[in-house]
């Protein structure tokens, strides 16, 4: 009842309650003749008002009826409108049950003539093609009966036939047959007369079209040969037969049309449904379920991390776990390639419950409350992610920053942001396995990388970009260095391609190690990064083992670095190993033969550890170095020397490192051809290389390297004492490496252009991950940071150099402490730029702790401790690789290899281990061992006053750099707003 009223509502304009019949339904269905329910549906059937089976509407309920009262004579059914009347009055609206049927009926009538002309084809049984206008088909019996009278008739002209048929039909008008039969006959005659050759041979009834037979029947009677009686009888018989047959034909035709039109109607309905479904697919919630078909192909995971997803409860004023229970979840950022949108999706590791599924909107404020707890809000909730490790947190933060930059238009979004993709592959952390599509992309990238590497400069710049993005990921302590993509955003576009290449470097990877020297360097970088994504777990272990062996070899002989060189190529940390190797030779040359190899080992080991830890902080460093190296190859083959610079810092005099580089690189060149050429070309430019390496990470362009050389030039010019500052710089560079990850953002390139030191500071802020490498990592980072944060690194290094010159006797210690301090500053700056205020707090705490320890310990140990805290703060994620390397390895290898050897081996171990144990080692054992190792090569003479002065100076420099970074960020934001 309710539905009928609803259907009828719009059909009646009267809304007065008095006009509605409460006792009876508005729509009444008359069922007097229920036996013929289908008659009302027939397309061509004329439905009389009040015909059975039609829906009637009360006239009293229509305003139209009141305006124009009905004419009498409608009988008992005058109370209701017929469907035809409703159609005429335009009162049959779409809610009427028969509305759609009659809509279709109108369409069918409109196209009926067209269907007759085109769609009604003759049957296959007829040998001849009949006229276009066909009468309905008839059975053979009917045809024989029709042929009985005109069998003897001969064909006449069409005009005489027409006259005869008209006369005969006119005589039949008085016959008892209904008057409608005459109209049917006339229509048939018209159809028969219209063809040019309507005459048909009646002797072949079975072979002729029924329409032709009918026509011949109608006009084959010859008045000239037949008597009037014969003609009248023939005409009567013809009229009767034609009337009956045409009625039957009309029924059959109606059925055919009805069925065909129903079929068309159903097809059209299906098409409409499909059309609506396609439209609805974009807006329906059901089609957006996680893992749905639409998301599988359109969305790609750019980062994955383990974290507990929390939601802030305003009522309870506390954080509560999202979902039904607490526990770790796999949180991923998905990038929709087509819509260029991002969203965060988290599933419980235990039961795969979806605990977060929120969009990342433009302008989202991502707050890194602490090193491992990040939060943001949307229109409904305040989300918090409590990450299981700092590496995960930093990687995720970088991916989030990259997504926000892509959304804001600051970063060109290539095929999904290679950096992000790189993260997706490398960052995998066991969360995401390579798909066939990923493998194909990696293979394609590898082939591209192979072509690019042949050109030393072009590949270098690309590799630098790749390395830079990846260096941040490496710092995170996971091969996934997927964080690299977030790194230099200016470079991200190139990084996207190269990051994928690097991610693919599985193929790149082995070959590049032995590829062209200058190209090989970039390739190494690529290969380092690429393996991480595909083979992170196995490769990390394998690399760690190789690196450990390499470290031992390095400790035993100065040539060991070259082995590391090649092996690193084999491993993801190829480029880093090369750097390490070069550094090793430098240190060896600089330091006493026994001690020199050991310190190089530490430096190299640190670097190598970085490589071995490619997943860990060391890998980030190696990435930075690789990028630096690549940068250097463009400007100069200084890239190899960049690693050496850290070596000289440890070794002591910068000059010896270049020599060693020349020596060892040459000896090692065969092993790491890519690195060697650049090293050979600029053995004396270690400082420049290093600076350039610093600049390189900061910005892919060659210009970046030149600015670093000046700062390094000071160190190199200083002579052996300057090397100590370089060492400090080396220590400092790790912070830049940290910065390197974030620097990819616009800040890094400006820093590169303006001056490596300042630029790295700005970009460096985002990449805190690099610090994790530890002491060894710190020196390593020094270079990457210099690349990424040229300005900060150079300024801090200059200040440190001054301090070191004052205390040249203990350049290593001061250098290490400075480097640690520099790392801390860089890391802090980077984090601050990333908005990680917690990093500053953490650094302050570590500084206080280190100061307390330094007061208890000797000045040298204090410096070491200080260095560690800085590194620690900088490389919190990398502590395992860098710090642990120095701490744990320090105890094992430091005795034989010196501080750097121990750090190297330790780093290797830490790569496999979790960052926390490494941090502990770094904090406890590595400090003393590092101090001892540093003391072995150089005299340690730093008073507490000197340390305090150095600390104060570092703090001042940090503040200045932070202020600069803030100003740069503000300027960048202003320029962005002005652009819009």
Curated annotation (Swiss-Prot):
Motif (KLKR): 800-803
SS bond partners: none
Biased composition (Basic and acidic residues): 852-871
Any single GO CC term annotated in Swiss-Prot or TrEMBL for this entry: filopodium tip
A Pfam cross-reference name: WH1
Residues annotated with Phosphotyrosine modification: 425, 607, 625, 650, 666, 826
Polar residues composition-biased segments: 448-469, 514-527, 570-581
Domain of life: Eukaryota
UniProt keyword Transferase, yes or no: no
Matches recorded under InterPro entries: PH-like_dom_sf, VASP_sf, VASP_tetra, WH1/EVH1_dom
Domain WH1 positions: 146-407
Posttranslational modification: Tyrosine phosphorylated on multiple sites by Abl kinase. In vitro, phosphorylation on specific tyrosine residues inhibits interaction with Abl and Src SH3 domains.
Region of interest (EVH2 block B), ranges: 837-854
Positions with biased composition (Pro residues): 643-659, 698-711, 719-774
Chief site of localization: other
Annotated Gly residues bias: 882-904
Region (EVH2): 791-980
GO terms assigned for molecular function: actin binding; SH3 domain binding
Annotated region described as Disordered, given as residue ranges: 125-145, 194-213, 448-547, 570-614, 630-927
Positions of the UniProt region annotated as EVH2 block C: 947-980
Residues carrying Phosphoserine: 905, 914, 924
PANTHER family: PROTEIN ENABLED, SPROUTY-RELATED, EVH1 DOMAIN-CONTAINING PROTEIN FAMILY MEMBER
Record-stated family: Belongs to the Ena/VASP family.
Function (record text): Functions, together with Abl, trio and fra, in a complex signaling network that regulates axon guidance at the CNS midline. Required in part for robo-mediated repulsive axon guidance. May be involved in lamellipodial dynamics.
Protein name per Swiss-Prot or TrEMBL: Protein enabled
Annotated organism of origin: Drosophila melanogaster
Gene that this sequence comes from: ena
């Amino acid at each position: 009842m309710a539905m009928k009223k609803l259907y009828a509502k719009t059909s009646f304009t009267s809304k007065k309650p008095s006009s509605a019949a409460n006792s009876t339904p508005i729509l009444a269905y008359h069922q007097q003749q229920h036996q013929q329910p289908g008659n009302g549906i027939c397309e061509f059937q004329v439905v009389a008002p009040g015909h059975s089976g039609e829906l009637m509407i009360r006239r009293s309920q229509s305003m139209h009826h009141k305006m124009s009262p009905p004419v009498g004579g409608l009988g008992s059914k005058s109370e209701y409108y017929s469907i035809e009347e409703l159609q005429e009055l335009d009162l049959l609206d779409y809610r009427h049950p028969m509305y759609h049927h009659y809509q279709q009926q109108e369409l069918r009538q409109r196209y009926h003539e067209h269907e007759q002309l085109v769609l009604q084809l003759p049957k296959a049984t007829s040998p001849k093609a009949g006229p276009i206008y066909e009468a309905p088909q008839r059975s053979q019996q009917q045809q024989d009966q029709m042929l009985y009278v005109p069998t003897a008739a001969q064909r006449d002209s069409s005009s005489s036939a027409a006259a005869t048929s008209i006369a005969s039909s006119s005589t039949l008008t008085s016959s008892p047959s209904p008057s409608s039969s005459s109209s049917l006959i006339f229509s048939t005659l018209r159809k028969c007369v219209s063809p040019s050759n309507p005459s048909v041979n009646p002797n072949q009834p079975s072979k002729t079209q029924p329409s032709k037979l009918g026509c011949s029947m109608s006009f084959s009677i010859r008045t000239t040969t037949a008597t009037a009686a014969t003609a009248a009888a023939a005409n009567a018989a013809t009229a009767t037969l034609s009337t009956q047959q045409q009625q039957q034909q009309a029924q059959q035709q109606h059925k055919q049309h009805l069925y065909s039109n129903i079929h068309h109607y159903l097809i059209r309905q299906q098409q409409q449904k499909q059309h609506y479904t396609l439209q609805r697919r974009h807006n329906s919630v059901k089609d957006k379920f996680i893992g749905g078909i639409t998301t599988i192909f359109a969305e790609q995971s750019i980062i994955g991390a383990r974290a507990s997803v929390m939601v802030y409860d305003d009522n309870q004023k506390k954080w509560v776990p999202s979902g039904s229970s607490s526990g770790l979840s796999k949180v991923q950022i998905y990038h929709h390639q087509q819509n260029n949108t991002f969203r965060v999706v988290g599933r419980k590791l235990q039961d795969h419950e979806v605990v977060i599924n929120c969009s990342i909107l433009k302008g989202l404020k991502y707050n890194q409350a602490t090193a491992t707890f990040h939060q943001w809000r949307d229109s409904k909730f305040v989300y918090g992610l409590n990450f299981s490790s700092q590496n995960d947190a930093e990687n995720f933060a970088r991916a989030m920053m990259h997504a926000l930059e892509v959304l804001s238009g600051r970063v060109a979004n290539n095929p999904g942001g290679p950096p992000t993709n790189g993260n997706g592959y490398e960052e995998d952390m066991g969360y995401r396995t390579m798909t066939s599509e990923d493998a194909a992309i990696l293979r394609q990238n590898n082939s591209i990388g192979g072509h690019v590497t042949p050109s030393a400069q072009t590949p270098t710049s690309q590799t630098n970009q790749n390395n830079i993005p990846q260096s941040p990921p490496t710092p995170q302590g996971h091969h996934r260095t997927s964080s690299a993509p977030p790194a230099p955003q200016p470079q991200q576009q190139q990084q996207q391609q190269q990051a994928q290449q690097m991610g693919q470097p599985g193929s790149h990877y082995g070959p590049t190690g032995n590829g062209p020297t200058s190209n090989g360097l970039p390739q190494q970088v690529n290969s380092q990064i690429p393996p991480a994504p595909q083979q992170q777990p196995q490769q990390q272990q394998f690399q760690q083992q190789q690196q450990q062996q390499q470290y031992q070899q390095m400790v035993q002989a100065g040539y060991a670095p070259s082995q590391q060189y090649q092996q690193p190529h084999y491993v993801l940390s190829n480029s880093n190993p090369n750097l390490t190797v070069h550094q090793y030779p430098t240190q060896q040359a600089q330091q006493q033969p026994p001690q020199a190899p050991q310190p190089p080992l530490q430096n190299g080991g640190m670097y190598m550890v970085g490589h071995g830890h490619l997943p860990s902080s060391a890998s980030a460093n190696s990435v930075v170095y690789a990028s630096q190296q690549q940068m250097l190859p463009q400007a100069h083959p200084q890239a190899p020397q960049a690693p050496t610079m850290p070596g000289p810092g440890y070794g002591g005099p910068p000059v010896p490192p270049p020599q060693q580089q020349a020596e060892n690189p040459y000896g090692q060149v065969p092993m790491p051809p890519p690195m060697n050429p650049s090293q050979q070309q600029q053995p004396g430019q270690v400082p420049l290389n290093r600076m350039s390496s610093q600049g390189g990470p900061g910005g892919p362009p060659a210009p970046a390297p030149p600015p670093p050389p000046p700062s390094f030039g000071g160190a190199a010019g200083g002579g052996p004492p300057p090397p100590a500052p370089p060492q400090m710089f080396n220590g400092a560079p790790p912070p830049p490496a940290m910065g390197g990850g974030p620097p990819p953002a616009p800040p890094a390139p400006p820093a590169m252009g303006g001056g490596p030191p300042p630029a790295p500071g700005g970009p460096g802020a985002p990449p805190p991950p690099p610090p994790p490498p530890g002491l060894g990592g710190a020196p390593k980072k020094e270079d990457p940071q210099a690349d990424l944060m040229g300005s900060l690194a150079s300024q801090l290094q200059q200040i440190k150099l001054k301090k070191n010159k004052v205390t040249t006797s203990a350049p290593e210690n001061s250098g290490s402490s400075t480097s640690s301090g520099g790392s801390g500053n860089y890391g802090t700056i980077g984090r601050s730029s990333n908005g990680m205020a917690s990093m500053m707090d953490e650094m302050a705490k570590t500084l206080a702790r280190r100061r307390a320890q330094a007061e208890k310990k000797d000045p040298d140990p204090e410096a070491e401790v200080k260095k560690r805290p800085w590194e620690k703060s900088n490389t919190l994620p990398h502590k395992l690789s860098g710090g642990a390397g120095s701490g744990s390895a320090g105890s094992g290898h430091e005795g034989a290899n010196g501080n750097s050897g121990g750090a190297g081996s330790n780093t290797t171990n830490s790569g496999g281990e979790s960052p926390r144990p490494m941090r502990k080692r770094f904090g406890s054992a590595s400090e003393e061992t590092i101090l001892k190792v540093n003391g072995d090569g150089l005299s340690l003479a730093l008073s507490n006053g000197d340390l305090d002065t150095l600390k104060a100076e570092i703090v001042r420099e940090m503040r200045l750099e932070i202020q600069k970074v803030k100003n740069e960020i503000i300027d960048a934001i202003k320029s962005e707003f002005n652009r819009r």
